[in-house]
């Protein structure tokens, strides 16, 4: 399943991120705020446990808590820019990291870094990456995470190319994908068009 999250605030913030004139600090702020809006939608089907609580008015009242732990796994490095947006809503979420690079001979993603919390098998996992281009990195990230048997896996990104979305859904149809915008295509250099450029460079001001 994939869902394009259609909301006026998302459209407004994404437009600011797309602008070539947007400076790094503004880009980061809008990415964080946009991620908050995205994750609100992506987590609406999380399972709950019913609990009893005491309020200032009554001794016993019905309440709820998340059934499973939440683990955020940003794909380095651009995915790091989305973490704080989620943590502001789910401060108890744990964080893992996956680093991948593309082998220039095979064009396939190669893992260069991986660090996961110990409780990932008890967690609903949310993979974070602003861009879904060819889909290779996301597919490989899911391949790696599946070995740890999490409760579920979702992927949240900002912009996606049709080619990448199709590939992810073909290989991992059970992974729900949430996107702010489905863009036109990949250009000859592998960039999403109209896209928003190199998200990592724009987040960290390295270009």
Swiss-Prot record:
Cofactor section: Mg(2+)
GO molecular function: GTP binding; magnesium ion binding; uracil phosphoribosyltransferase activity
Residues that, per the record, bind 5-phospho-alpha-D-ribose 1-diphosphate: 77, 102, 129-137, 198
Pfam families: UPRTase
Catalyses which reaction(s): UMP + diphosphate = 5-phospho-alpha-D-ribose 1-diphosphate + uracil
Top-level taxonomic group: Bacteria
Enzyme type, top EC level: transferase
EC number from the UniProt entry: 2.4.2.9
Pathway assigned in UniProt: Pyrimidine metabolism; UMP biosynthesis via salvage pathway; UMP from uracil: step 1/1
Protein keywords: Allosteric enzyme, Glycosyltransferase, GTP-binding, Magnesium, Nucleotide-binding, Transferase
Binding site for uracil: 192, 197-199
NCBIfam families, alphabetized: PRK00129.1, upp
Function description: Catalyzes the conversion of uracil and 5-phospho-alpha-D-ribose 1-diphosphate (PRPP) to UMP and diphosphate.
Entry's family note: Belongs to the UPRTase family.
HAMAP family documented for this protein: Upp_B (MF_01218_B)
Protein name: Uracil phosphoribosyltransferase
Organism encoding this protein: Ureaplasma parvum serovar 3 (strain ATCC 700970)
Lineage: Bacteria, Bacillati, Mycoplasmatota, Mycoplasmoidales, Mycoplasmoidaceae
């Amino acid at each position: 399943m994939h869902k394009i999250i259609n909301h006026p605030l998302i459209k407004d913030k994404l437009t600011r991120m797309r602008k070539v004139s947007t400076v790094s600090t503004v880009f980061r702020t809008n990415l964080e705020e946009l991620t908050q809006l995205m994750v609100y939608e992506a987590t609406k089907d999380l399972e709950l446990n019913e609990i009893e609580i005491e309020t200032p008015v009554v001794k016993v009242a019905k309440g709820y808590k998340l059934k499973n732990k939440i683990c955020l796994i940003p794909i380095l490095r651009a995915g790091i820019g989305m973490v704080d947006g989620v943590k502001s809503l789910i401060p108890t979420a744990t964080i893992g990291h996956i680093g991948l690079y593309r082998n220039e001979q095979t064009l396939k993603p190669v893992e260069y870094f991986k660090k996961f919390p110990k409780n990932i098998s008890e967690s609903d996992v949310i993979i974070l990456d602003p861009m879904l281009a060819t889909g290779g990195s996301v597919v490989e990230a899911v391949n790696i995470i599946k070995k740890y048997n999490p409760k579920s896996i979702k992927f949240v990104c900002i912009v996606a190319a049709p080619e990448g979305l199709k590939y992810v859904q073909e290989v991992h149809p059970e992974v729900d994908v949430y996107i702010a915008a489905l863009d036109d295509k990949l250009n000859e250099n592998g960039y999403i068009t109209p896209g928003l450029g190199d998200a990592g460079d724009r987040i960290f001001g390295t270009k």
